[in-house]
């Protein structure tokens, strides 16, 4: 849009009116908005308004609200936006006594994104907007610092070219590095005015060559184009990936903050920095941050220069440091949360550019919450809401096993995000994504000079990140802490050659596929493949925190566990029962699979029973171990579920082996073994085994299987009871679709129970229930509840059968569905509340209408997903069951659901 077109749009809009206020001003000690308006102003805009109203030294400006972004995305932008924006600009110019990009004292502004929820580095920023060929000369004269002026202009052209005009950033960097090389300069700040002028001229030629247009000289053109580019950045790939990872709604949109520039690159008495009121990695109550002198904000977080610790500022500029401490301390008490802040020092004067609630690791989140309760800033109930349920996984991140190992520490960087990662290295985000998708490397470490927001997809699939540049507030550090991944940043002894895909350190060269071990807690980079151990969930802070969490929740939290070792781990993580023991997993052990295969290959009941008789003591021993590990807690045992062919070799493998033997050794006795096996495999082959002969259908066709499993369960329970234990047995029949199927299998279980109790002279209380994993079972739950004493929703299969989507094949189209907004999230990760969830809700109500005491839970992967757990609470389930390592997450999510219900009342909606 040209300057004339901009003015025309203003004129055309002056005759219209709308109730929507698009632009909110802040400055002069007052703001149109306030800190509670995050939905409208975004987090950054609301924070700027709040700081301004609090009288803090905030450069003035204005915020264009999120509705404008949503209109932009819909392609229906109100002309009133420009009217209000230019009115706010005039107000800003009057307050500053400057004009945007004109006059002897030109006003320059920054244009930044700012969504409701923090998305660090995911969207775009333009600094020094308003500079042009005339304004740069005025700025050079006014500041008496030509180097500063020309450096600011070349930064604008590069940022504007990259963000607004889509000129590849690497082409600007190529020009910049070339001039540095020719002039013999190592550091950016050593470039002199003439060299910077040369860079500016080359940058402008590049813009013209790439776009066919000159770099815009009209300040209003720059402003409108920059604003629209920030709106567009809401939809860039990295922002969409981040929102998907953090479950931020795509239609929230971003606000745009236009703010008068203050300059940290004006000279050696100027600087810029970022910080936290507490350590975001550990939660320690210590002032934490980094800064650079003679730099702009992007220099600190980009990783291009390694910044200084903020403690150095106390020595260099004690008055500024003390003022910063006082302001940020005041803001922490005001917001009652750890603050993430940005500041600039211009000619010795401090300006606050932003404050917001800081991103932190799970370890830090728990410690900060506990400390703030002790300090009287928040209550225990508020503390429960201060930690995201998935953050508790940080307490379970792996640790390196070092005892008895010969360790070669290659370098020590900054401990940017705790935990450990051991994997094979790759050097680009694209390679990481490909290696993960293809299975080339099972565990990946992404090695970069520094990461940028474009690397987000690679960071997502990597287990750990290593950078040679950057600090504790660099992009890599901030993003990995939020993701709960290990990161070592600023490992200065490492040279990363991304072009040749090599890492050079201490005279050694590591190439793609080589193994490294990272310790994100200490910052060490270690050669080779160390072993790892999970962290112990007995951290004192975690124990304290969970002691606040558990009394609040109503929902029981069970674990999915198949063997005694898993059950013991589940107890350590707070499991109140086993919600799913998959008995078929016991058959895959090396000493059992041959008996299982013999049972399958048997062509009569007598031979099947003979094979099952050999499996009986093995299953009984496993169940005894489970009952002992869980003591008096409930143990839900599912009878055999998968189709029989899963216990046999693959048909394709058998065909290849038989064909090879026929060609090479046709008289081999092994052929006599393999041919009957192949015949049975082919006999059991199904076109759609997920809906074939499995679950209760196996028990109906081969009742001796159900009989053997029931006998093993009850004999184990009796043995444990005789030894002084108190087993609580719940037997669950899978894939039930009708009351008739349930009656058939329940009768077998109850008959075997009576036989065992009569033989042993001991009775054990037990229940028989079923899995609800077919839509028909949900629809007829009132009938099934006549026989079933409990329901457990197998939400994995219920999702498959409701959507008609195979969980194994969904990745072929899930990315496209997410991109087009058909799915907002993976339905196998988060329960589909509108569809599958309604079946769960309906079946629960119908079942309890028949049997008011019906116990109901879920045992799919959704049992460890926070949103799914909260849904289960709202519809009145008794428990959720998940993998042991998701128990902490489920416990916290259940407590948060109870508190949300306390605040809003019981849910009366469909969700």
What label would you give each PLM region?
Residues 377-461, 524-525, 529-530, 545-550, ...:
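Protease-associated
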Residues 353-355, 511-560, 566:
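C-terminal domain-closing interface element
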Residues 483-485:
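Residues forming the flavin
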Residues 2-408, 442-445, 452-454, 463, ...:
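Nucleotide/phosphate-binding sheet-loop regions of phosphoryl- and nucleotidyl-transfer enzymes
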């Amino acid at each position: 849009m040209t300057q004339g077109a901009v003015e025309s749009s203003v004129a055309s809009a002056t005759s219209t009116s709308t109730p929507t206020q698009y632009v909110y001003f802040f400055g002069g000690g007052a703001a149109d908005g306030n800190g509670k308006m995050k939905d409208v102003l975004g987090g950054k805009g609301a924070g700027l308004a709040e700081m301004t109203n609090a009288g803090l030294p905030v450069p003035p400006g204005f915020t264009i609200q999120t509705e404008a972004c949503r209109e932009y995305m819909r392609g229906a932008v109100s002309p009133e936006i420009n009217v209000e924006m230019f009115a706010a600009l005039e107000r800003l110019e009057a307050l500053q006594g400057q004009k945007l990009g004109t006059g002897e004292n030109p006003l320059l502004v920054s244009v930044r994104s700012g969504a409701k929820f923090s998305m660090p580095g995911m969207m775009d920023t333009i600094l020094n907007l308003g500079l042009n060929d005339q304004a740069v000369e005025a700025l050079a004269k006014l500041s008496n610092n030509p180097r500063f002026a020309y450096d600011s202009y070349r930064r604008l052209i590069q940022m504007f070219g990259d963000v607004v005009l889509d000129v590849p950033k690497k082409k600007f960097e190529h020009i910049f590095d070339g001039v540095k090389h020719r002039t013999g300069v190592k550091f950016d700040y050593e470039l002199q005015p003439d060299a910077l002028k040369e860079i500016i001229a080359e940058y402008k030629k590049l813009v013209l060559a790439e776009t066919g247009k000159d770099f815009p000289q009209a300040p209003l053109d720059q402003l409108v184009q920059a604003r629209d580019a920030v709106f567009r950045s809401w939809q860039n790939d990295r922002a969409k990936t981040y929102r998907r990872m953090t479950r931020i709604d795509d239609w929230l949109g971003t606000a745009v903050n236009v703010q008068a520039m203050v300059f940290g690159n004006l000279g050696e008495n100027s600087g810029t920095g970022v910080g936290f009121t507490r350590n975001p990695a550990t939660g320690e109550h210590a002032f934490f941050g980094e800064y650079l002198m003679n730099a702009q904000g992007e220099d600190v977080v980009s990783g291009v220069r390694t910044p200084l610790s903020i403690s150095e500022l106390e020595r260099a500029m004690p008055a500024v440091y003390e003022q910063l401490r006082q302001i940020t301390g005041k803001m922490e008490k005001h917001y009652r949360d750890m603050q993430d802040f940005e500041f600039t020092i211009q000619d010795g004067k401090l300006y606050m550019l932003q404050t917001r609630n800081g991103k932190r690791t799970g370890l830090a989140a728990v410690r900060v919450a506990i400390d703030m309760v002790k300090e009287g800033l928040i209550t225990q109930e508020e503390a429960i809401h201060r930690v995201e349920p998935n953050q508790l996984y940080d307490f379970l991140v792996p640790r390196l096993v070092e005892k008895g190992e010969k360790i070669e520490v290659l370098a020590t960087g900054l401990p940017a995000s705790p935990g450990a990662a051991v994997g094979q290295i790759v050097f680009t985000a694209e390679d990481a994504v490909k290696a993960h998708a293809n299975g080339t490397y099972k565990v990946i470490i992404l090695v970069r000079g520094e990461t940028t927001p474009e690397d987000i997809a690679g960071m997502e699939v990597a287990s750990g990140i290593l950078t040679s540049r950057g600090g504790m507030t660099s992009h890599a550090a901030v993003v990995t802490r939020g993701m709960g991944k290990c990161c070592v940043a600023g490992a200065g002894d490492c040279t990363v050659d991304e072009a040749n895909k090599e890492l050079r350190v201490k005279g050694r060269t590591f190439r793609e596929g080589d193994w490294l071990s990272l310790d994100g807690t200490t910052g060490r980079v270690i050669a080779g493949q160390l072993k790892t151990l999970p962290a112990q969930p007995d951290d004192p802070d975690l124990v304290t925190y969970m002691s606040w969490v558990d009394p609040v929740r109503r929902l029981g939290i069970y674990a999915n566990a198949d063997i005694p070792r898993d059950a013991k781990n589940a107890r350590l993580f707070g499991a109140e029962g086993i919600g799913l023991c998959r008995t078929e997993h016991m058959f895959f052990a090396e000493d059992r699979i041959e008996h299982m295969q013999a049972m399958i290959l048997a062509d009569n009941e007598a031979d099947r029973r003979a094979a099952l008789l050999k499996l009986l003591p093995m299953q009984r021993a496993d169940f005894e171990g489970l009952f002992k590990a869980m003591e008096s807690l409930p143990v839900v045992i599912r009878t055999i579920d998968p189709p029989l062919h899963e216990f046999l070799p693959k048909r394709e493998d058998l065909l290849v082996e038989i064909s090879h033997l026929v060609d090479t050794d046709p008289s081999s006795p092994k052929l006599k073994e393999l041919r009957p096996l192949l015949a049975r495999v082919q006999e059991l082959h199904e076109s759609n085994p997920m809906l074939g002969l499995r679950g209760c259908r196996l028990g109906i066709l081969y009742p001796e299987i159900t009989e053997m499993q029931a006998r093993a369960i009850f004999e184990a329970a009796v043995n444990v009871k005789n030894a002084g234990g108190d087993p609580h047995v719940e037997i669950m029949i899978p894939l039930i679709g009708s009351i008739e199927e349930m009656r058939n299998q329940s009768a077998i279980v109850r008959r075997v129970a009576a036989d065992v109790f009569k033989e042993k002279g001991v009775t054990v209380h037990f229940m028989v229930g079923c899995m609800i994993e077919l839509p028909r079972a949900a629809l007829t739950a009132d009938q099934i509840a006549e026989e079933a004493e409990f329901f457990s929703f197998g939400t994995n299969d219920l999702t498959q059968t409701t959507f008609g989507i195979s969980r194994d094949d969904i990745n072929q189209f899930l990315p496209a569905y997410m991109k087009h907004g058909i799915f907002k999230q993976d339905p196998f990760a988060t329960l589909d509340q509108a569809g599958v969830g309604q079946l769960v809700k309906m079946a629960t109500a119908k079942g309890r209408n028949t049997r008011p005491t019906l116990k109901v839970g879920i045992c799919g992967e959704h049992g460890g997903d926070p949103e799914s757990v909260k849904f289960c609470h709202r519809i009145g389930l008794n428990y959720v069951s998940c993998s042991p390592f998701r128990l902490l997450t489920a416990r916290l999510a259940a407590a948060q659901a109870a508190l949300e219900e306390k605040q809003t009342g019981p849910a009366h909606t469909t969700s």
